[in-house]
Amino acid sequence: MKLAAIVVIAVATMVVTLAAAKGVPSTVTYIPHDKVNTTMAKGGQIIGENGLIVLANRRGAGEVEVHENTNHVFIIVEGEATFVTGGTMVEPKNTAPGQIRAKSVNGGQTYHLTKGDVITVPAKTPHWFKDVPTQTIAYYAVNLEP
């Protein structure tokens, strides 16, 4: 079994464990690969129920984001990006309930994300796809909310 597959299985197990602890229903949800692939091609929601949201995202560089109640697990499947977490947001603005955005951040920890990488971002932590040299980065976002 390839390392990337092992990492995805380990992360999925962790997410299911965390989700169960947060009160997310423990019912089985099956999504066939063709729907997952179609969703990844355009971006969108794969699963959305009671505190657990799984998205397929395809994007370029963006703004700094903070989500008050959302914990993220990002699983990179294509492309590469410079990703920044933490630091102090420059001129933050509330853009929706529980969500703050800014154009940049001072300080923070920088990571170079590529295919097969997994990164977790706790709620209330600034995070930013600062640079995407491949023009787009594709990833699954597993979002857990209380």
PLM-predicted stretches and their roles:
Residues 1-7:
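Positively charged n-region of N-terminal signal peptides that target proteins for export
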Residues 4, 14-69:
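A short, N-terminal "cap"/entry segment at the start of jelly-roll beta-barrel domains
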Residues 55, 83-85, 139:
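Short hydrophobic/aromatic-rich beta-strand segments that constitute the beta-sheet cores
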Residues 65, 72-75, 110-111, 118-119:
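His/acidic/aromatic-lined binding-pocket segments of jelly-roll/cupin-type domains
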Residues 68-83, 87-89, 97-104:
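Short, conserved beta-strand element in jelly-roll/cupin
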Residues 89-91, 135-136:
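Short, surface-exposed beta-strand-loop junctions and turns on beta-sheet-rich folds
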Residues 95-123:
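Short acidic-glycine-tyrosine-enriched beta hairpin
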Residues 112-117, 123-146:
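Ligand-binding loop in jelly-roll beta-barrel domains
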